[in-house]
Every structure is written in structure tokens, then in C-alpha cells.
A protein has these predicted regions:
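Hydrophobic beta-strand anchors of alpha/beta hydrolase catalytic cores
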Residues: 24-25, 57
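Short helix-capping segments at alpha-helix termini
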Residues: 48-53, 77
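Thiol-/selenol-based redox modules, centered on thioredoxin-like
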Residues: 102-137
Length: 137
């Protein structure tokens, strides 16, 4: 899909500046208990491991206000970038209608979806990390 996101820090992420990078979109919300469980693992096992490579991890908060999202980020102690999908259209560009929110979508260096997860399953999460590692080698 066409990607044009403004991150909370003002940075713009789009198809053009994603080229050549591995990008993970982590769809989340402050009310999502599975997301909250997964986020420390994303921070420690994915972001801290790959952040110095050609890699971007973006938390995409679904339909929440800026203050709620800021508090959510603070509470979960993650340091990766965030954006707000205020109307859910970005999320829906990757999913079926009424899909569950907890998911990670890995985009390869050519802009293609190369891996996705649903919910938080330790085995699937480990496979995602292995997949990212292979893409970056």
C-alpha cells in the first residue's frame, strides 16, 4: 500500500524513504492487553537488537488521542517511534475488516510484505526475529 505517515517526532515515513530498509509496523492501542504484553519484547529483542542497522520499527496506535498515546508509550517504556492511525485507514490497508489489532507487519527492502504476526505467540515472534535478521544480512 501507499505509505505516508507522520511520526510523533515529526519525521515522515513513506514508500520512498523506506526503500532499502527493513520496516516493522507494530499495530497497537493502549487498551490492547496482548499488545502491552508484546511491547517489552519488541523493544528489547527487536528494536534494541536491530536499531543500528537499516531497520525501522514503528508503533502504529489505532484511533487514540495524542495524550493517551504519549502516556501509553511512557507506561510501556518503549523507545521506538510511534504514529497515530486516527481513522484506522492505515491499519485497514493491511487487514480484513474487523481484524484484531495485535499484529506486526514486516516490510522488506523492496517494500513488500515479507512476514506478519497475529497476537503474541513466542514461537512466531522468534520466527519474526530470525526473518528480520536474515533480511538484514
Amino acid at each position: 500500500p501507499e505509505i505516508d505517515l507522520k511520526l510523533l517526532d515529526g519525521q515522515i515515513i513513506n514508500n520512498e524513504n523506506m526503500q532499502g530498509k527493513v520496516v516493522v509496523f507494530q499495530f497497537t492501542a493502549s487498551w490492547c492487553s496482548v499488545c502491552i504484553k508484546e511491547m517489552p519484547h519488541l523493544e528489547k529483542e527487536v528494536w534494541q537488537r536491530f536499531k543500528d542497522e537499516n531497520f525501522i520499527l514503528i508503533g502504529v496506535d489505532l484511533k487514540e488521542d495524542l495524550e493517551v498515546v504519549k502516556e501509553f508509550i511512557s507506561k510501556t517504556e518503549v523507545t521506538y517511534s510511534f504514529t497515530i492511525d486516527s481513522d484506522g485507514s492505515f491499519f485497514e490497508s493491511f487487514t480484513l475488516p474487523k481484524a484484531g489489532i495485535t499484529r506486526n507487519i514486516v516490510i522488506d527492502q523492496e517494500g513488500k510484505i515479507s512476514f506478519l504476526t497475529r497476537l503474541y505467540d513466542e514461537l512466531e515472534f522468534a520466527q519474526m526475529i530470525e526473518h528480520i535478521d536474515k533480511l538484514l544480512k
